[in-house]
Amino acid sequence: MNVHFKNINPVDSSVLKKRPVRILVFKTNLRFKKDIRHIEPLLDQHPGIMCWNVDRYDIDNVLRIETMHIQPKEIIRLVTKAGYFCEELPD
C-alpha cells in the first residue's frame, strides 16, 4: 500500500469536545505522484482540512480527509476543479 500523508495539523483538544472530527472518503483518479503533487497545495492550504492522504494502490485511489466542518461537496468541487474525478464513497 502506498499512502501519502499530508497537512497533519495538531488540534486543540477543547475544540474536539465541541465538534468531533469527521472522516470523509472519496473515490478518485489520483493515480500518480504527479497527480498528488498537483492537488497537494490545494488541500494543504485549505484551513478546514486537518489531515489528508491518498492510497494510490487501492482500486478506488482513495482520498481520505479529516475535518471538523467541511462538507463532501466542497472537497468534490476542489478536486474536480483541479481536473480530477472525485466521488464520495458511502460509509
Where in this protein do the model-derived segments appear?
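Short amphipathic alpha-helices in soluble, non-transmembrane regions
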Residues: H38-L43, E74-G83
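Conserved phosphate-binding loops in N-terminal lobes of ATP-dependent enzymes
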Residues: N2-H4
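Helix N-cap motif at beta-to-alpha junctions
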Residues: T67-P72
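Short amphipathic beta-strand starts and helix->beta connectors
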Residues: K6-D12, D44-C51
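Short amphipathic alpha-helix segments
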Residues: N29-P47
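Conserved short beta-strand edge segments in small beta-sheet-based binding/regulatory domains
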Residues: K17, W52-V54, G83-D91
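Surface-exposed aromatic
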Residues: D58-I65
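Short glycine-/aliphatic-rich beta-strand segments at the starts of folded cytosolic domains
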Residues: S13-R31
